[in-house]
Each structure stands twice: as structure tokens, then as C-alpha cells.
A protein has these predicted regions:
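Soluble FAD-dependent oxygen oxidases
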Residues: 1-436
Length: 436
């Protein structure tokens, strides 16, 4: 291994670290603290040339490479080869006239929002703008206004990718369409993506936000939501409902600290008056919220709809796609995750899909989830610190219990960006790509 280390340190401008060195643990850390990676070599690329050099050196030595961007993805434990981090490739260049952005592999959606929104342009980002752009796009991307505009990867123009032999290639619908098909939804394994060029929307505001309801109201909120999405909801409206068990932390608003709540999440593209009319039947059948607002929202603040966690933690996660969500599904969810259940589950979310999520993609892609009516996302975290593997096993069992509860309504597949550690344990669930 001495030879490959020497070659990497001579060719790469970023840190090349081994387990005994300072900075190694911080370099390989991801968002899920339960993922205890221990690669013999960690390489941090600070330029695209670093990626090319690392891939070529690893290929010559027969060393496998695992790539981590911002670290939010669910990656099996890495114990061999090279862990290559791209989080320092953070360049974002916006072309206002072309309505496009070139985004480095380490940049987050926050960085794109910061540059694009002052010009009245909007990237089709996810619910958590702190997530890396490239990893999100490689899985498709189901965001807060996705029923209107589709998967985020539908708006990718091209990728720059370093292939297994070290060749740097620009891939688009016109140049290498087969690889472009695979990269939009296939998630990984085709090379190291160093940047993506994405289309931007001409959109400066939306109508949206999140409202929270007390534990006692959770059954009524879920039942009202089910009836609402079973009605004729236009594609301009994207919603979800979540059962949240929130920690008692000072960073949370006082009404929510330590509480079990339901949250209604709304993203609407159009006039506020139209949105109010659409939501009126739902609001008329649920109690008053205890916190939160839904109204006109600058696109730069789209992350406040979900307010997803930004602090790394040890957690167990899973997703599943449903072909329907009816009154019996609601009852099944309440039985395993309702306010009466003592559980380590932090979130059980039901997302309304359909609309532009159903495709078809043009050009074709490998995105999983087109055609599903709903998506379920589940995450749990042991409350005690330090991290206890036994507690994580209990948490994973609770997450699996939700998957089992909704199995009668499942398509049998998972949207790949929502394929979590519980999905992949022991073989996991199917992730289905579209026919090519």
C-alpha cells in the first residue's frame, strides 16, 4: 500500500489520509453516524484533476473506489480500497440568460439557491437544501413542487464524469445517451460525477409551508389528508403529511419541543388565492394548528416547508412506494406509528406523488418511482448517546414494522433516493428502473 499512497500524494492536491492521521475521521464522516466507514485510504479531491488522478492510480493498482459527496446517501460500510470525497468541489456557476447552472459534485442546493434566486431563477431542489446536488440528481429527486415539475433529474442537461479508466467525459442526451439514461436515476457505479448542468425555473415565489398539529389530532389529520388527496387535486399542488416525534431541544420552537405532532407540508405553484381555495376543504376538517404557517414563500426559503434535520445523527431509514393510500392504509400507519405507540421512530411521512412524477421522461431515464401514487419515508434514531448498536437494532425493527404495515398497498419497489439502511439490510426491497 506504500506505493499507492506515494503515488496519490504526489498526484493529488487534496488530503490523502490513512486511519492513524489527524483529519481522517472528519474526512470520511457522513450524515448517518451509524455508518462507521474504515477505508485504508481516504482521498479528498479539490479539483477535477484530483479525481482523474485518483481513478487512474486506483485502476492501475486494482483498488476499488467508493465515492462520497456531502455524505447524505446510504452507503454500505466501507472497509477496503479508497474512499474518495468530492465535498470540496463546490463551484456553482449560473448563466442567467441560459437559465442554467453548472454545479460541482460537492455543492449543496443551498449554494445554488444563494446564486440563482436573486436573479429570479429556481433550481428544482429537494426538501432539504443542505443535501448535495449531484448525489440527489443521480437518484432522480422528489422535491416539494415535484407534482408540478417532475423529478429533479428531468431538468439535467449534462453531467461531467470520470470513467473507470480515468477518462473525463461530458455526457448528455446527444453525447453518450445510454450513459446519460443510466446516470439520471441509476444513482451510482458508472464513474465519478464531478459536476452537473441543470436547467433553472423562472420562479421567484411559491405558496407553501408547514403546519403542525398536536398528538391528539394526528388520527384526524391523517384521515382528513387521505380524503383530500383522494379528491381531484391539481398537479400544481404537492403535499405530504408526517408524524413527527421531536426531541426536547432548544433549537426547536417551544410548542414543538419533545412533542409528537403531525405536520402538513404544502408546495403550490400559482396564485395564493387559488391555493387557499384548494386547501379550504382540508383545513375545515382538522383542528387548528399549534405552530407553523402556509402562505406566500420566497423560493429561496423552500427548505422551510419540511425543515429537515441538518445535524448528523445515527439513524435507521427506509422508504417504500404505494399504489394507493386509503382509509385502511391510514389505520395501518396509526397502529404502528400513531401517538399511542412508544417507538423510536422520528418521522413517518406519506408523500402524494402522481402529477408530473408519472413522466414519461424525455429523454428516457432510469428513475425509479414513476407511476407510484404515494411514497412513504421512515426514519428512526436512538435517543441515548453515545451511539449504542443494540438500540439501533431496536430502531431498525421499528422502521421495518412500518414497511410491513403498509406492504399490502406497496408497489414492491423503493424510490432509490429513499432506499435506506433498513431497505438494504439482508437484501432489502426492489428498486425498479424504467425500461431503456
Amino acid at each position: 500500500m506504500h506505493d499507492i499512497l506515494a503515488s496519490l500524494r504526489a498526484a493529488v492536491g487534496g488530503p490523502v489520509l490513512t486511519p492513524e492521521q489527524d483529519g481522517y475521521r472528519a474526512e470520511i464522516a457522513g450524515f448517518d453516524l451509524a455508518q462507521d466507514h474504515r477505508p485504508p485510504i481516504a482521498v479528498s479531491a479539490v479539483t477535477v484533476r484530483d479525481v482523474v488522478a485518483t481513478v487512474r492510480i486506483a485502476a492501475a493498482a486494482g483498488f476499488p473506489i467508493t465515492v462520497i459527496g456531502d455524505g447524505h446517501g446510504d452507503i454500505p460500510r466501507v472497509t477496503d480500497g479508497i474512499l474518495l470525497t468530492t465535498r470540496r468541489l463546490t463551484d456553482v456557476r449560473v448563466d442567467i440568460a441560459d437559465r442554467s447552472a453548472v454545479v460541482g459534485a460537492g455543492a449543496t442546493w443551498h449554494a445554488v439557491l444563494d446564486v440563482a434566486t436573486p436573479a429570479g431563477l429556481a433550481p428544482l431542489c429537494g426538501s432539504a437544501p443542505a443535501v448535495g446536488v449531484v448525489g440527489y440528481l443521480l437518484g432522480g429527486g422528489m422535491g416539494p413542487i415535484g407534482r408540478t415539475f417532475g423529478f429533479s433529474s428531468d431538468h439535467v442537461r449534462s453531467f461531467d464524469i470520470v470513467l473507470a479508466d480515468g477518462e473525463l467525459r461530458t455526457v448528455s442526451a446527444e453525447r453518450d445517451p445510454d450513459l446519460f439514461w443510466a446516470l439520471r436515476g441509476g444513482k451510482g457505479g458508472f464513474g465519478v460525477v464531478t459536476s452537473a448542468t441543470v436547467e433553472l425555473l423562472e420562479l421567484s415565489t411559491i405558496y407553501g409551508g408547514g403546519q403542525f398539529y398536536p398528538a391528539a389530532a394526528i388520527p384526524a389529520v391523517l384521515r382528513a389528508y387521505q380524503r383530500f388527496v383522494d379528491s381531484d387535486v391539481p398537479d400544481s399542488l404537492t403535499t405530504s403529511v408526517a408524524i413527527l416525534r421531536l426531541p426536547d431541544l432548544p433549537m426547536l420552537p417551544p410548542p414543538l419541543r419533545g412533542q409528537t405532532v403531525a405536520q402538513l407540508r404544502v408546495g403550490f405553484v400559482g396564485a395564493a388565492a387559488e391555493a387557499e381555495d384548494l386547501l379550504a376543504p382540508l383545513r375545515a376538517t382538522v383542528p387548528a394548528p399549534i405552530f407553523g404557517t402556509i402562505g406566500e414563500l420566497p423560493y429561496a426559503e423552500i427548505g422551510t416547508i419540511h425543515n429537515d434535520p441538518t445535524v448528523p445523527s445515527a439513524h435507521a431509514t427506509a422508504g417504500i412506494l404505494l399504489d394507493r393510500f386509503d382509509a385502511d392504509t391510514v389505520q395501518a400507519v396509526l397502529a404502528v406509528a400513531g401517538p399511542q405507540v412508544a417507538t423510536p421512530l422520528g418521522i413517518v411521512e406519506i408523500r402524494h406523488l402522481g402529477g408530473a412524477f408519472t413522466g414519461p421522461a424525455s429523454p428516457p431515464d432510469a428513475v425509479s418511482g414513476r407511476g407510484a401514487a404515494f411514497g412513504v419515508w421512515v426514519s428512526g434514531a436512538p435517543m441515548q448517546l453515545p451511539f449504542d448498536p443494540n438500540a439501533m437494532s431496536h430502531t431498525a425493527a421499528a422502521v421495518r414494522g412500518v414497511l410491513d404495515a403498509v406492504a399490502p398497498w406497496s408497489t414492491g419497489a423503493v424510490q432509490i433516493n429513499f432506499c435506506g439502511s433498513v431497505n438494504t439490510a439482508g437484501g432489502g426491497r426492489r428498486v425498479v428502473a424504467r425500461d431503456h
